Amino acid sequence: MSVHKMVKRITSSQIRARKGQQPIVSLTAYQAYTARIADPYCDILLVGDSVGMVVYGFETTLPVNLDMMILHGQAVVRGSQKALVVIDMPFGSYEESKEQAFLNASRILAQTGCGAVKLEGGVYMAETIDFLCKRGIPVMGHIGLTPQAVNRFGGFNTQGRKESDWQRIEDDAVVIENAGAFAIVLEGIVEPLAVKLTEKLSIPTIGIGASNQCDGQVLVMEDMLGYGAHVPKFVRRYGDLEQAMETAIKNYAEDVTSRAFPAEKEVYKLK
C-alpha cells in the first residue's frame, strides 16, 4: 500500500497571522503548469484578472468575465498543493449589490476549490466585504491603483502623490480591515504612504509598486520572468523568458526546415 504525503494548503487565517512576520511571497498564476512551478516557493497564488492582458491580449482587465476567472482558477488549484489560491472577482461581478457579490463569490469558491477571493475598492465596498466575510467567504482587499477603475483614474497612475489624497486612501484601508478582510493589496501608491498603512493596519499588506516594508509582495509572474516589452517601474526581472522562448522557437524552425528534426532517435521504427 503506497503512502502519499498530504500537503496542507495555507489558509487565509494563516496569512492574516503572518502580519509583521516573515514577508509573504505571492505571484500571479493562470495555468496549472505555472502554478506547479511556483507553488513550492509561494504563500499565495493570485489568479488575477490581469489574465485578460497577459494571456488574452486585452488592453485592460475590464473585458474579463466570471467564467474566465473560474476556468483559470480551476487550473491553478489543480496545479498547486501548498499555496493559498486567491481569485480576483472580475469587473461587473460584485459592484451591483452585496447579494450579487455573494452569489458570484460563492460560485468561484464552489467551482474552483480556491481559498479566497479578491475585490477592488475602498470605503464603498466595505458593506460588501462585511457581507461576504460573515457568510464564510475570505476576502482580500485591494486599494490604491485599482485596474478595474482605469477609466476613472484616467490610466494606470500612481496614487498618493498628493498628500491631500492620503486620508482618502487611509480611510479605504482602515474600513476594509474593519469589514473583515484578511489582507489587503496596496498597488501603485507612494512608498511613505505604503509604510504608514503597513504600520497602521493589523492585517498584512501585500505590495505591488508600494514598499519593501509591506508585509508581502506580489508581481505578475510573466513580468518578473521577462515576458513582454513593457516593464513597469516596480518590476524586477528575474529572467528573460521572452528571449528564451524566441531562441527555442527559432532553433526549432531551423531544424524543421533543414530536416534536422525529427532525428533518428525521435522517430518510431518497425520492430
Swiss-Prot record:
Chemical reaction(s) catalysed: 3-methyl-2-oxobutanoate + (6R)-5,10-methylene-5,6,7,8-tetrahydrofolate + H2O = 2-dehydropantoate + (6S)-5,6,7,8-tetrahydrofolate
Record: residues binding 3-methyl-2-oxobutanoate: D49, S50, D88, K118
Name of the top EC class for this enzyme: transferase
Cofactor(s), names only, from the UniProt record: Mg(2+)
CDD domains: KPHMT-like
Active site: E187
A GO molecular-function descriptor: magnesium ion binding
Keyword Ribonucleoprotein: no
CC annotations in GO: cytoplasm
Pathway connected to this protein: Cofactor biosynthesis; (R)-pantothenate biosynthesis; (R)-pantoate from 3-methyl-2-oxobutanoate: step 1/2
Subcellular location: Cytoplasm
Note describing how the cofactor binds: Binds 1 Mg(2+) ion per subunit.
Biological processes, Gene Ontology terms: pantothenate biosynthetic process
Binding locations of Mg(2+): D49, D88, E120
EC numbers on record: 2.1.2.11
Keyword terms of this UniProt record: Cytoplasm, Magnesium, Metal-binding, Pantothenate biosynthesis, Transferase
The family this protein is said to belong to: Belongs to the PanB family.
UniProt subunit comment: Homodecamer; pentamer of dimers.
Function in brief: Catalyzes the reversible reaction in which hydroxymethyl group from 5,10-methylenetetrahydrofolate is transferred onto alpha-ketoisovalerate to form ketopantoate.
Protein name according to UniProt: 3-methyl-2-oxobutanoate hydroxymethyltransferase
Lineage, highest ranks first: Bacteria, Pseudomonadati, Pseudomonadota, Alphaproteobacteria, Hyphomicrobiales
